Amino acid sequence: MIESIGEETFNFQDERFADIQMLRYRLPDFDSLTIRQKQLIYCLSEATLFGRDITFDQFGKYNLRIRKTLEAVYLNFNGDRLEHNFRALEEYLKHVWFASGIYHHYACDKFSPLFSEDFFRNEVLAIDSKLLPLNDGEIFDPTILPKRVDKSDGKDIVRSSACNYYDGVSQHEVEEFYAKLKKDGPTNEAPSYGLNSTLVKEGDSIREDVWKIDGKYGAAIEKIVYWLNRAKDFVENDEQLHVINLLIRYYETGDLHNFDIYSIEWLREQEGRIDFINGFIEVYGDPMGLKGSWEGIVEYKDLEATHRTQAISANAQWFEDHSPVDPQFRKAIVKGVTANVICAAMLGGDEYPASAIGINLPNADWIRAEHGSKSVTISNLT
């Protein structure tokens, strides 16, 4: 993050490798924030950073082991760092850092390393024996778990996808499990079943391993909650405090009903200049469209640009009434449309480093219908 650098000296472009161009971004008007607001951003940013390993693990069962082994080789390498194999390993490691794993962040295809397997094996054997050895094929065999999200026709898309949301279950078993939950659950205001859990088969039984403070990913979530608690000392208003408390309760219980309550109150909080997203949100990384990848963003309002945007959102009903669609598809009453322009202060998880340029949440259809949504454009990334 770069802040307060003149237009004539600021260079948006950073390093380039393979098909990736890294870009820098500024934090305009950050100096105009109060010390208290900056402290709030700091605590929320720390909470964002501690979700990184969750995303790595979600994106592939072996991602964390591969990353940590690569990092150990990189740090302990004593040979010629200009040599082809080491340079190729360095580029591969950058791919892994960027994509939160060994699969392309957009295409979801497995990366093909350009360093030799013999080179890598020798370097692993030359360093600390406490490092976990990799199994054959996890890096070098393109046929082993070749795609993070595989929706190819005719395949069991759960078993053919390398993402780490399911353990030992088939596509049919996933469909049956969640169909039963939906059938037995409420017809109105239903939770987003499966959003925060790994579905696991043990023997003949199938259960959810819920992502919460005393469940899976508990070590990382405990640190996230620690910094959320620290952030409470610097909130801008009582509603922000309420929102943070609700998020903490959700992380402690893993109860999706609590997540919906949090989402509604997060949506209602409009007065503070600082806002954030922290949790299991988007389901694009799951071939079944159920499991939320962890993501985080800390933001503050771009006041001038928000003023312009809100002039449009205030007239949302007029735009709906005059939209060029069949009248039967127009909403008679437009609810809860808010539009802000924000500056991203910190990105994490599935939002980093390939970030969205805009966000519209919550995702639950019934919340959007009854309570509306928050729509933001990220001005310092566009």
Predicted regions: what they are:
Residues 2-85:
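Zn2+-dependent metallopeptidase catalytic domains
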